[in-house]
Amino acid sequence: MRYSSFILLFLSAALCTTRLTAQNNAAATAAQNTAGAPDAVGSTLTLPQAVTIAIKNNLIVNQSDLSSQSYKISFDQSWEYMLPTLNASGGQSLNFGRTLVTTNNSYATSETNSGSASISAGLTLFHGLVYQNNIRMQRYAWDASKMDLQAQKDNITLTVLLDYLAILSNRDQLNLAYEQSRVDSVSLDRVTKQADAGALNPVSNLTDLQGQYASDQINIANAINTLEQSKVTLFSILNVSYKADVEYQNTITATDISQYPATSDTIFQHAMQIIPTIKSAQLKVYAYEKNLAVQRGYYYPTISLGGSVATNWTNIPSPTSSVVTSTQIVKSGNYFTDANGNNPVYTITQNGYNIYPKFSDQFKNDRGESFGLNVSIPILNGLQTRNSVRQAKLTLKNYEYQNTTARHTLQQTVESDFQNMMAAYKTYKFYVQAAAAYKESFRVTNIRFTQGVIASDAYILAKGNSDRAEVNLAAAKYIYLFRTKVLDYYQGKLTIE
């Protein structure tokens, strides 16, 4: 096809300029279970619908969203580190042999059953501002992850925009191929009738036009294949099953083509304020500045409050009292002698039982409380804090370099895309003039050919020039449009309609 190489060049240049990672995203998305992906494509697919579906189904975007949610959890946890601690514990044990009974501090040789319970609480009063700086660090990290997520969405948006415009461009190319074939068909019919009527020297004109018409059919077949391939590419980004009978809306008219109203410097200044990758790089610098402050905080003492309540119980506690149920006085069988002679010795025997404390009484009576102020001063811990601080400094410096690199890259990219836009606009304007000139030239040539003034070779040459100019003009329109959309993105003005 005579214009297929030009279209391929257009797509390649546009992809390289915007530095999109469409192929990586498509490869990662293909790893998903496409059978379970939502198929939201109906009979008509608009550009906003395509962007929405692609963002929803893209694996890279979903992974970035999960990462952002993880950073949100870390941020929540950083606040919760400042809350008091409150813990409860309890246990029950069965002991055999010689066992210390903690309730009465005595030993028992029988089987014992004992238990304990405690509640403890603590509150950190000062920790070198570690918690406060960690909160700020996690907040910056969370914000950076949201910018990374938005960058992925923007990447998908631009990729879908490019693929959608490629479909519109290829559809226009197909329509042009049909129109070119129609014009040649009219001329071929006329010359065929002349040949059938025995007109003078129509044979060479007829064979030339037959060859031209056959070339038109080849161009149509190639245009159809190119259009279908561009549709397949779009559906691979959408991660849905391919549907051939989908209508694509074209909201682009000739009135959309005008000189872009901005300078490269203005675009760059806007981009510095809104591009997610730039924001993410700066936020990561802020985050690791706070990470350095966190690591330095471990040099300082930790002051905390602590308290606890504990109790225990056993199945063989010490008796609290005893109850006498009867008293007996009996002779012991022994005697003592005094002036009156031998006298019997009596013994007093009391019968009764011991009263042991109930479980609830043990739980209450054996309870103990404690409260204290604790100070922990780091003196020497394998130089862990020192090395952590050194590592934090290196990490911070690395992210500062990344931030600087991101800014320089953005400036170069904006300038390059701006120059490409200017070139695309000039090219479009030249093709407007060329198409108009070649169209008029073909009109005159067609009249002269119809009148038999010129031969078919002049007709075919003029028509070929006109056809190429129309094809190039259609492609140039979409090239310029995409260039302007990229610059709109840099300024936060990109609209998907």
Label every PLM stretch briefly.
Residues 155-273, 420, 424, 444, ...:
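Periplasmic alpha-helical coiled-coil/stalk elements that build and connect Gram-negative outer-membrane
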Residues 51-55, 206, 210, 240-355, ...:
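Amphipathic alpha-helical coiled-coil scaffold segments and their short linker/junction regions
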Residues 22-91, 97, 171, 200-203, ...:
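Bacterial Sec-pathway N-terminal export signals of envelope proteins
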Residues 62-66, 79, 125-153, 204, ...:
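Sec/SRP-type N-terminal targeting helices
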Residues 7, 22-40, 320-325, 472-497:
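Acidic, low-complexity, intrinsically disordered peripheral segments
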Residues 31-43, 89-123, 251-259, 306-377:
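Small/polar, glycine/serine/threonine/aspartate-rich low-complexity segments that form flexible
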Residues 189, 215-240, 432-493:
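Short segments within alpha-helical structural elements
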Residues 7-14:
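Bacterial N-terminal signal peptides
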